[in-house]
Amino acid sequence: MKTKLYLLTGFLGSGKTTLLLEMLKRLDNKKIGVIQNEIGKISIDGEILRNDDIQMVELNRGSIFCSCLKLNFVQALADMAEKDFEYLFVESSGIGDPSNLDEILKAVTVIAGDKYEFKGAICLADAINFENQLEEDEAVERQIKHCNMAIITKSDVTGDEGFEKVLNKIKEINPICRVEKSVNGVMDYSFLDEDLIQYKWAESEESTNSVETKPKTLFLNFEGEVEQEKLTAFLEDMTDDVYRMKGFFNLKGEGWNQVDVVGKKIDYKPCSDKGNSQLVFISKKGPAIIKKIFSSWEERVGLEMKLKN
């Protein structure tokens, strides 16, 4: 029996990992594999997904659709094909442009044989930030253009008017794709029993992902506790200059929390002990952001930290 293969796309912070966790819960009696891709070298989402019952491969430091990682992705798919999974989910980086997926799947077939049944590309669209993201990065349009199903997230915040705006934008880009809505991963998952590829709109094309277009990522490491109010002030200073910030911090009086920043929205969620606090920045300004990180951290937090590429 062939492995059912799904691709999850969606710009940074759209809720891919949340949705994937919900799908894994609903398939907990199945043999499942996950390929998880992040633009930086430290995998925050991989840490969230890690589970003894799930076999996971992490491909970091680039997009799996870029020449810098494409061959690694093909080989990972070929290797996973030998493990007789019932389902394999690929969660791509938020900046991933999947326009060349057909080419990649053909290469996997040459290496590993006809082991996969591709069920479809699912793209998540953040109702709060989608329109701004669409203007900022071409990958957002490509993700919608090449998806079979779009899932609009966070419409509980924007309401029906916000949902309709995003729906209309999606249909302008891809008139064929199926569109659903999800709030915090809650939705009808009956699509897992369907062939989403019937909703195909665009033909394969060259991905816009390249070494030259890869955004700068930086990693802040910090030992000890930090006050949530001070950390929040620092994060607020940085929101205009980043696509995304995410990580883990030991908050004074609160314990360990997962920190997630998309647009102006800052979320804290309790999590297990991670040893050292860390934060990933995906910069809109390239290396120019480094000076601001140091100056704002010193002003708002005032404790020693280390910043790495």
Predicted features and spans:
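C-terminal accessory "lid"/substrate-recognition subdomains
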Residues: 2, 142, 146-277, 285-309
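Nucleotide-state-sensitive switch-loop elements of NTP-binding domains
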Residues: 2-14, 18-133
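Phenylalanine-focused residue identity feature
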Residues: 11, 65, 73, 85, ...
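Flexible glycine-/small-residue-rich
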Residues: 36, 125, 261-263, 283
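A residue-level signal for conserved active-site and pocket-lining positions in enzyme catalytic cores
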Residues: 38, 121, 179, 231, ...
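Short, intrinsically disordered/low-complexity patches at protein termini
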Residues: 56, 67-68, 113, 169, ...
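Small-molecule kinase domains that catalyze NTP-dependent phosphoryl transfer to phosphate-bearing small molecules
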Residues: 121, 140-143
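Charged helix-capping and loop-helix junction motifs
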Residues: 136-138
